[in-house]
């Protein structure tokens, strides 16, 4: 009996020892796993820090050699930039105060787009008044000589009056990529009145988004040695945010004398899209875009 008890005690002690060894092995394995995981986490953190440093230095270097701040939103992701429903002959150039899609056949813009804030409206930079070819255009570009004796004004699309906030923006507004042959009375009359109205909207609403440009018919006339296309008409669409809601409105002006109230030129953005083949304000959610682009009422837009 005594011998039997000794054997039982020995077996129990052996089982306990095996259990302790097993538990210790498991604890050791778990500790080892935790050490490895911690090392991996620290390694990933160091790698991320290193990559961020590399990317920051690359971004700074790129900005230094090109003058371009890559932290800014690309032009094609900005709210005011339209999309074309058909293939355009174009060079798209970003300037300080506006972006232009320049038609390399017509030698006038397809469209000019910009954002205008209330602070920009009250700028004090003097008017440049010197038209020059756009240095960023590759290939042919219209010149101011093309307009001499043509009977047409050099009509701004993005107006100089909207660029008084910066000397460079003002200078670039006089690039010939930003002008079209425009009837004098329209340029100095109803078109100018709309420009002033847009500035007023910017002041009242802190910011507006503007897209404007020519509408060119198939059998268009030309002016100058470079055969610059004469538009049949001009469009402008405006987007603003007021009282928690987006609002949009379009305008179309025939390239001739008018002297009419602005509301007679008002159209829905949908109508302007049909005339131009452009799709405006595509960054907005579809339900909002579809709803606001139905409005063609000047009064409703201002309400």
Per-segment meaning from a language model:
Residues 11-19:
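Bacterial N-terminal signal peptides
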């Amino acid at each position: 009996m005594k011998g039997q008890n000794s054997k039982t005690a020995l077996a129990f002690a052996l089982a306990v020892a095996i259990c302790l060894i097993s538990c210790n092995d498991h604890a050791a394995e778990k500790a080892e796993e935790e050490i490895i995981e911690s090392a991996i986490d620290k390694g990933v953190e160091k790698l991320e820090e290193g990559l961020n440093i590399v990317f920051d230095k690359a971004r700074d270097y790129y900005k230094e050699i090109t003058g371009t701040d890559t932290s800014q939103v690309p032009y094609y992701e900005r709210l005011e930039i339209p999309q074309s429903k058909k293939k355009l002959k174009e060079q798209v150039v970003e300037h300080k105060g506006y972006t232009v899609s320049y038609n390399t056949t017509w030698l006038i813009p397809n469209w000019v787009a910009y954002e205008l804030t209330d602070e920009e409206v009250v700028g004090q930079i003097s008017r440049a008044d010197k038209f020059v070819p756009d240095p960023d255009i590759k290939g042919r570009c219209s010149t101011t000589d093309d307009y001499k004796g043509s009977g047409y004004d050099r009509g701004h699309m993005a107006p100089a009056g909207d660029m008084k906030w910066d000397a460079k923006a003002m200078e670039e507004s006089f690039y010939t990529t930003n002008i079209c042959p425009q009837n004098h009375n329209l340029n100095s009359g109803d078109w100018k009145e709309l420009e002033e109205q847009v500035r007023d909207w910017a002041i009242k609403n802190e910011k507006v988004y503007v897209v404007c440009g020519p509408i060119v018919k198939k059998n268009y006339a030309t002016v100058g040695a470079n055969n610059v296309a004469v538009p049949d008409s001009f469009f402008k669409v405006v987007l603003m945010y007021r009282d928690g809601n987006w609002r949009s409105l379009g305008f179309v002006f025939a390239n001739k004398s008018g002297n009419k109230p602005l509301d007679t030129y008002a159209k829905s953005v949908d109508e302007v899209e049909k005339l131009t083949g452009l799709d405006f304000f595509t960054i907005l959610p579809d339900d909002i875009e579809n709803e606001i682009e139905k409005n063609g009422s000047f009064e409703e837009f201002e309400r």
